[in-house]
Amino acid sequence: MQPARRVVTSTVRLRARGGVSGVFTCRGCLTRPRLPLPASAPQQRRGLSGSAPRNAAPPGLYPAGIAELSSRKLISVSGPDAAKYLQGVITANLTPGYAGPNPTSEHLRSDAGFYAAFLTAQGRILHDVFIYRDVRDTTHPAGHSWLVEVDAAEADRLQKHIKRYKLRAKFDVRLLNEGEGRVWHAWDDANPSSLTTTQPSFPSSSPTIITTPDHRAPNLGHRLLTFSTPTPSLPLPTLPETAYRLRRYRHGIAEGQAELLYNTALPHESNLDATGAVDFRKGCYVGQELTIRTEHRGVVRKRVLPCVLYPDGQAEGGGVVVVPGEVGFRSDVGAEGVTAEMVPAEASIGRVGKKGRSAGKWLSGVGNLGLALCRLEIMTDVVLPGETGGTGFVEGDEFVVGLGGGSGEEGGEGKKVRIKAFVPDWLRTALASKEGH
């Protein structure tokens, strides 16, 4: 009886028409006979780089496209006190350069939209949001009308939260119906700047589309809001929302309260400090105290990182176990049809062959790609401020997460898959810049 072995297929990158990259899996690789390995052959480990690739375009990750985000909804906040109220409850700065109590339209930031978050008084994330100037509104003066984009499953809760704490502030809050406004995300890796010149002009005095760059990660794309047109008129292929999720996951960007856990996640651990959601020069907003203290005096030991799942090497005897060397995508983990969707949310991550504290917590994923909250000193080579290397990370260590019915620790009950975290270049750069301050 031949020993069990793993078959690794090769991929060939092709340049398709129009500059769109594709991936071809050689049929010969699927049918070519494999030489059996001796039963006693040790498992070989390859590709343990801890950094995401700079220019690779993994299979299944589209280099250009536009996707409607049904997972997001819009809330209208309009009235004389709308800007003042928002300034006091979000992490971003609505009035950069002005610290007075009564901002006017001249003091407001000029960009069409920006990323921010609502926090609890203890500094934990309630909602991650994009906030836009509502330039459709002609019934209020400039700067009195705003649109808040939020996780669709949390939109009603945020609306109630705003109403509860508005007190005597003069503004109205309303959740937009699906037909009133839609959220899209567009990207074009070959020409990222092309989207800045595509905003259409419209016959009425109010535009029916709002566009703004998504600055959470370099060249992540653009956010678009449409109000009367079914689809933005852009020369890009229309893709399902899953394509956008995979793009986020590859860049290490969490979104919504399934990934930024409501009243649990912390801004720094969720990378909000590195994605432009927090203005640390701003004062007097809900949750500021802990957020500022963490920035200047705390050590952030956990961060949300992109992760790749691959088969548990202990499931078969002998063979070659290929440890992912890049954040590449496939529709399953490569073991009995297992996918990232089968990993329970918040499942614990453990180190293979060792017991001890959890190395992280799984958040969400598609196929073999997803996000996890990872302990940096255990799962990555990142050296924390004030510490030296060798505090926990060991080159060659592997990690495992359970599919349910047991913990992620090696030896736990239930099926397991292995997991590897990567630190995106943009996050490494952001962390390095903090060390210089």
UniProtKB/Swiss-Prot annotation:
Residues 35-56 are annotated as: Disordered. The keyword Hydrolase does not apply. NCBIfam families: ygfZ_signature (TIGR03317). InterPro entries: TrmE/GcvT_dom1, YgfZ/GcvT, YgfZ/GcvT_CS. Belongs to the GcvT family. CAF17/IBA57 subfamily. This is Iron-sulfur cluster assembly factor IBA57 homolog, mitochondrial. GO terms for cellular component: mitochondrial matrix. Pfam families: Beta-barrel_CAF17_C (PF25455). One of its GO terms (molecular function) is transferase activity. Keywords: Mitochondrion, Transit peptide. It is found in: Mitochondrion matrix. Residues 1-14 form a transit peptide. Its main location: mitochondrion. It comes from Chaetomium globosum (strain ATCC 6205 / CBS 148.51 / DSM 1962 / NBRC 6347 / NRRL 1970) (Soil fungus). GO terms for biological process: iron-sulfur cluster assembly.
